[in-house]
From Swiss-Prot:
SUPFAM superfamilies referenced in this protein's UniProt entry, alphabetically: 2,3-Bisphosphoglycerate-independent phosphoglycerate mutase, substrate-binding domain (SSF64158), Alkaline phosphatase-like (SSF53649)
Name of the gene encoding the protein in the UniProt record: gpmI
Subunit structure: Monomer.
Taxonomic lineage: Bacteria, Pseudomonadati, Pseudomonadota, Gammaproteobacteria, Vibrionales
Protein name: 2,3-bisphosphoglycerate-independent phosphoglycerate mutase
Functional summary from the UniProt entry: Catalyzes the interconversion of 2-phosphoglycerate and 3-phosphoglycerate.
Species of provenance: Vibrio cholerae serotype O1 (strain ATCC 39315 / El Tor Inaba N16961)
Keywords, ordered alphabetically: Glycolysis, Isomerase, Manganese, Metal-binding
GO annotation, biological process: carbohydrate metabolic process; glucose catabolic process; glycolytic process
Length: 510
């Protein structure tokens, strides 16, 4: 069997394009490989945000959305737009699963709890959805409505939670019932790297109403956290309970609506509420009517309000149907993105699909090790390219995004330099086997490390375009005006394969 010449796609997570060098970790890093590719190879810029990826206009892209669009080869309307539309149409307020959970709790005189990432960030959740759910619970007769706020500071400025908390305090005052019952940073409640000691702190706060602190109001608790030098993301578990208020600990028969719609950081805390769980020993395990807003994983035996919209003939499925082999490879932090999200929400491998996982380093925050596990990842990727086993390879380097999120500029520069070195090795390997390579990003981040409006640290993604570079033996030029959903059709065309009718993306070269 002759060696295969792979079509590789390397996704540089968080590597956006911005001409201005000010506070731009990518432009100011020493990146001779990427500089040379942008100067000498076919290249263009493509859109990775807003309506072009199925998000609201102007909304920054993110990894889940980016990989879903890339793999689908069509614009995929994201849960954010889908749920917002349902609220506007009135469909949300009549959602059978939400209605049943609320009504059951109301009939039994029990509480309705809502938890989720409380911010307008729009990556994992949107506070507008939580607002609508609180209003819905109140309208359906719930008297005890408890809101458990996971604070952001990652997809939003590091100290921006106060506006959101005030908004909900005002809502409860207007309704004359319900209250904010707890606050905790997403570092604890939304871990995705099996740091169960963090998750346990959030779980105890929810189920036992036990935190490290108790304050009368959420805003007071937040100000105390800032005084302890804890930004939103890292706020320690705090119970909110004024004198004379009853505990909001979760009880048998209560309803719990988890209002995050993005799966990867919702899974761990959700699994703590499922009978079969071994992450830590639970001090309490209330029997709740738990509703996931969307399906976080097929193997979680809980109901969800908005089931997955199935995507037919994604890039991975189409390759599989054509009898081709493919490899998906990344570090822990972005492994779900090159597998589950890239496959349109399909958990299992397609026939002919292999997966390799490289463990991300166990550090508190990635500015402490900006290169992450890029060397080991590249060793495996280069070996895979040279193996002759794969028709297609999809790889993600997480550094630009994961280190960009820390807000530590010097570390982000080092992260970009580490990735550039790795890309040099990948390009060399592709040329050696006469393969083809597209280099792109799923969204921006590291190109803007200071917020131009506030002058503070910028830890969030951007809505700037991302590069697309071709390395290979075809004499092509890349078109302008493309978007992430054009990549799958482009790769199929480069591989001389048919493009399924389901893919509405365009081929980006001529």
């Amino acid at each position: 069997m002759s060696a295969k010449k792979p079509m590789a796609l390397v996704i540089l997570d968080g590597w956006g394009y911005r001409e201005d060098n000010a506070n731009n970790a990518i432009n100011n890093a020493r990146t001779p490989v990427m500089d040379s590719l942008m100067a000498n190879n076919p290249h263009t810029l493509i859109s990775a945000s807003g309506m072009d990826v199925g998000l609201p206009d102007g909304q920054m892209g993110n990894s889940e959305v980016g990989h879903t669009n890339i793999g689908a080869g069509r614009i995929v309307y994201q849960d954010l737009t889908r749920i917002t539309k349902a609220i506007m149409d009135g469909e949300f307020q009549h959602n059978k699963v939400l209605v049943a959970a609320i009504d059951k709790a109301v009939a039994a005189g029990k509480a309705v709890h809502l938890m989720g990432l409380m911010s307008p960030g729009g990556v994992h959740s949107h506070e507008d959805h939580i607002y609508a759910a609180v209003e819905m619970a109140a309208a359906r007769g719930a008297e005890k409505i408890y809101l458990h706020c996971f604070l952001d500071g990652r997809d939003t400025p590091p100290r921006s939670a106060e506006a959101s908390l005030k908004r909900f305090q005002d809502l409860f005052a207007k309704l004359g019932k319900g209250r904010i019952a707890s606050i905790v940073g997403r570092y604890y409640a939304m871990d995705r790297d099996n740091n169960w000691d963090r998750v346990e702190k959030a779980y105890d706060l929810l189920t036992l109403a036990q935190g490290e602190f108790t304050y009368d109001s959420a805003v007071e608790a937040l100000q105390a956290a800032y005084a302890r030098e804890e930004n939103d993301e890292f706020v320690k578990a705090t119970e909110i309970r004024a004198a004379g208020q009853e505990s909001a600990a979760m009880q048998d028969g209560d309803a719990l609506l988890f209002m995050n719609y993005r799966a990867d950081r919702a899974r761990q805390i959700t699994r703590t509420f499922v009978p079969d769980f071994a992450g830590f020993s639970r001090k309490a395990f209330p029997a709740l009517d738990f509703v996931m807003l969307t399906q976080y994983a097929a193997d979680i035996p809980l109901q969800c309000a908005f089931g997955p919209a199935s995507l037919e003939n994604t890039y991975g499925e189409w390759l599989s149907k054509a009898g081709k082999t493919q490899l998906r490879i990344s570090e822990t932090e972005k492994y779900a993105h090159v597998t589950f999200f890239f496959n349109g929400g399909v958990e299992n491998e397609f026939p002919g699909e292999e997966r390799q996982l490289v463990a991300s380093p166990k550090v508190a925050t990635y500015d402490l090790q900006p290169e992450m596990s890029s060397k080991e990842l590249t060793d495996k990727l280069v070996a895979a390219i040279k193996s002759g086993k794969y028709d297609a390879i999809i790889c993600n380097y997480p550094n630009g995004d994961m280190v960009g999120h820390t807000g530590v500029y010097e570390a982000a520069v080092k992260a970009c330099e580490a990735v550039d070195e790795c890309i040099g090795r990948v390009v060399e390997a592709i040329k050696e086997v006469d393969g083809q390579l597209l280099i792109t990003a799923d969204h921006g981040n590291a190109e803007m490390m200071i917020d131009p409006e506030t002058g503070g640290v910028h830890t969030a993604h951007t809505s700037l375009p991302v590069p697309l570079i071709y390395v290979g033996n075809k004499a092509i030029s890349l078109k302008e005006g493309g978007k992430l959903s054009d990549l799958a059709p482009t790769m199929l065309a480069l591989s001389d394969l048919d493009i399924p009718a389901d893919m509405s993306g365009q081929v980006l070269y001529s």
